[in-house]
């Protein structure tokens, strides 16, 4: 899959959600990424929080434990990033 996005045009929220999807579903393919996106959406709905708040809540998604957005942005360069970004939007 060709990379069609440019990181400069992505919002902080989109990056955080896509990175969460990519990191938590690593190796699981599109079904796994879809499942992580569904968990984020469901938690946001149930807890009346933004998806970003859900992703960054301590110990909810292990990829963020002790990590920053800058330290994980490299994930947006993997081939699966386009699908994760589409789900994040």
Question: Language-model features: where?
Answer:
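Bacterial extracytoplasmic/cell-wall-associated proteins, especially those involved in peptidoglycan
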Residues: 2-89
């Amino acid at each position: 899959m060709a990379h069609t996005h440019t990181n400069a045009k992505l919002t902080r929220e989109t990056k955080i959600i896509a990175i969460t999807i990519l990191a938590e579903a690593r190796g699981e393919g599109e079904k796994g990424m879809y499942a992580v996106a569904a968990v984020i959406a469901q938690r946001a709905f149930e807890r009346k929080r933004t998806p970003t708040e859900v992703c960054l809540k301590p110990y909810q998604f292990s990829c963020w434990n002790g990590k920053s957005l800058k330290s994980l942005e490299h994930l947006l360069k993997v081939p699966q990033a386009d699908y994760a970004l589409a789900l994040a939007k």
